[in-house]
Amino acid sequence: MPRKIRELIRELERAGFVNHGGKGDHRNFEHAKGVRLTLSGQPGNDAKPYQEREVRKKIQESNQ
């Protein structure tokens, strides 16, 4: 079962990403190390597989 967008947002915030807003259902996150990510979708929607992969990849980049 796919995870929800709100779970991905929570995971990004725990990893140190800050939400800088966005238009509509888009959210722009940035880490202090300069890693950026745009996540789209309403919090209650299911996350697409590519979104889950992208979040994992960006969190790994921020930990290096």
Short names for language-model regions:
Residues 26-30:
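Minor-groove-contacting beta-hairpin "wing" of winged helix-turn-helix DNA-binding domains
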